Each structure stands twice: as structure tokens, then as C-alpha cells.
């Protein structure tokens, strides 16, 4: 199954279908239809948040999924599949990939990332693990821990990378990431135009995830309204 996912999405677009509780489209049904639209457009895969959304999407489309679970804990800034509890729950859906935060910030309950990875390898040996990283240092951490896929997801979204954009200086950061690891790299985070997606692939990314620019109509509309 591991090679199947990587082969399926190689050189392609993965569409993130997510809506948090404070967003207008927050609904597992709506996310499943968003995934159906993504499939109709030719997406090679879907990235989805929460067990209920993942299951609803699986019922609607047969595309491979990157699953995650966003949960806020009072004792940690980490919120993307932060503990072994969420990792297990997402993996149990049968999604091809489980994504989690790899930003070096303290996890809830004092959990250690290395222990989480070891547990997942034992309990879900066929599930790919994707590292949502923010810096080159954490790309190297993820590589050393044996993550199957390196994502640039958190670049620009952590205290260490505030204000950063993947497209800055002709994608200089992404080029560094590609030099720092031999594992498949999936570009994600602020890839908001077809041209940026194509550039990521041309530079050597295995695939690209696009979310907000496609599946968040409130944000899309705001871009137009702000230009008035």
C-alpha cells in the first residue's frame, strides 16, 4: 500500500478538504462533496481532518487520503495529530497516510515524537507517516525518525517561521528542503496559484497539496473583496 500511494500522487495535485468548526462549510457531508468535486477536477488524492470527515470522504470517493486530526490541548501549541491517541484514531480509518506536526515544539502530555513513531510502526506498519515540518532542522529530525514523507506544511505557521512564505526568493526554502532529504517531499502551505504548484513540481517535489485556494470560499471571496 505504501508504494501505491506514492505512485498514485507522484507529480500530481492533492486537494485539502478541511473546514474547522468556526468556518461556514464545517460539515462532514460538505467535505465529502468537496472531495467529489476535487476528484472530478482530476486531483490524485485528498487531505482531510478528523475521523468523521475522513470516513465521509472515503464513502464518497476512492482517492487515497492523507488523514490528520486537529486538536487543541491546553499544555501544547502542537495541534496537528498531536498525540498517539489521535494518530491511532486516524490510522484506524484505513487512510493511506497519517500526517502529524514535526515542529520541535512540546507535545501534549509530554509525549515524545520518537515514541509515537515507534508505536505507529508497530501497530500500523502499512500506514505511511507524513511530517508536517516548519524548518530545515525539523526536516532533518523527521528524516532521521524515518517519516515516509516530508511536508512543508508548517513553514510560516510557527513562531520560528512567522511571516515566511514557500514562494519567497524563488522558493529558496523549498530548494533547501529538497537538498536536506532524499525522502519524497510534498509541498504544502500557501501554494495558492497553479503557477506556484507547477514550480514546486518542477523543482522536484513528489506532489503538492493545495487547500485554501481551492476549498475555502470565504478566504477566496475575501481576496476579491479586499481588492475593492
Curated annotation (Swiss-Prot):
Reactions catalysed according to its record: an N-acyl-D-glucosamine 6-phosphate = an N-acyl-D-mannosamine 6-phosphate
Top-level enzyme category: isomerase
GO biological process, any: N-acetylneuraminate catabolic process
A GO molecular-function annotation: N-acylglucosamine-6-phosphate 2-epimerase activity
EC number(s) on file: 5.1.3.9
Gene3D superfamilies: Aldolase class I (3.20.20.70)
Keywords from the named record: Carbohydrate metabolism, Isomerase
One Gene Ontology cellular component: cytosol
Domain of life, source organism: Bacteria
PANTHER family: N-ACETYLMANNOSAMINE-6-PHOSPHATE 2-EPIMERASE-RELATED (PTHR36204:SF1)
Entry function: Converts N-acetylmannosamine-6-phosphate (ManNAc-6-P) to N-acetylglucosamine-6-phosphate (GlcNAc-6-P).
Protein name per UniProt: Putative N-acetylmannosamine-6-phosphate 2-epimerase
Organism: Lactiplantibacillus plantarum (strain ATCC BAA-793 / NCIMB 8826 / WCFS1) (Lactobacillus plantarum)
